[in-house]
Design a protein with these regions (language model features):
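Small/polar-rich, solvent-exposed N-terminal microdomains that initiate assembly or binding
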Residues: 1-73
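Secretory pathway export signals and precursors
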Residues: 38-40, 68, 84, 123, ...
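The N-terminal extracellular segments of secreted preproproteins, especially immediately downstream
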Residues: 41-43, 71, 87, 126, ...
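General secretory precursor processing signal
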Residues: 45-47, 75, 130, 155
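Oligomerization/assembly interface segments of phage tail-like spikes and tubes
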Residues: 75-90, 150-165
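A solvent-exposed, charged loop/short amphipathic helix patch at secondary-structure junctions
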Residues: 93-109
Length: 166
């Protein structure tokens, strides 16, 4: 099992590295980031992983709402790992004309390819980590399209992972 003070960083880093290796077009900027994921310099692409909420659990993936019995603490800890791949998206030209449908189509293909590759990388990695007993359990959430916001758009994938408390 993954343990210690950096256990959630370790999980997030493994997932970020798996996505990076799976992407057909790997972004220049990638890594584990603290807190909310900022879309800085999305023109060259961005892959970021972050650790969201961390909470005690007795019945994964549900947070422990109260102590049960005489126990002092829940036996498990769960964390939400947030992963995003963001790309440059088409926008209006200097005359204010909207992007062409061909440009939008190309962007949609790239972003949907990223979604497929993200989901495959995360699923494969978490399944292997679970089989190898590096983690206790996991649940993948739905992929959620992001943006466009400004000239950036992409995908967000979340997974909840369980480890023993320590």
């Amino acid at each position: 099992m993954i343990t210690g003070e950096l256990k959630w960083y370790t999980v997030a880093s493994r997932l970020e590295q798996a996505i990076y290796a799976e992407l057909t077009v790997a972004p220049d900027r990638h890594g584990v980031v603290p807190g909310a994921i900022a879309w800085d310099a999305c023109d060259c692409g961005l892959l970021a992983a972050s650790v969201g909420q961390i909470y005690p659990t007795e019945q994964f993936p549900n947070p422990a709402l109260a102590r049960v019995g005489n126990g002092c603490d829940a036996p498990w800890e769960a964390a939400e790992i947030i992963m995003q791949v963001v790309r440059c998206t088409p926008t209006h030209d200097d005359q204010g004309n909207p992007p062409t449908t061909a440009a939008l189509d190309t962007s949609a293909r790239e972003i949907l390819t990223d979604a497929h590759q993200m989901m495959r990388a995360v699923s494969t990695t978490l399944c292997q980590m679970n089989r190898d007993r590096e983690i206790s359990d996991f649940v993948m959430r739905a992929n959620t399209p992001q943006g466009p916001s400004g000239v950036c758009g992409g995908n967000e994938l979340r997974a909840v992972v369980s480890l023993p408390r320590n």
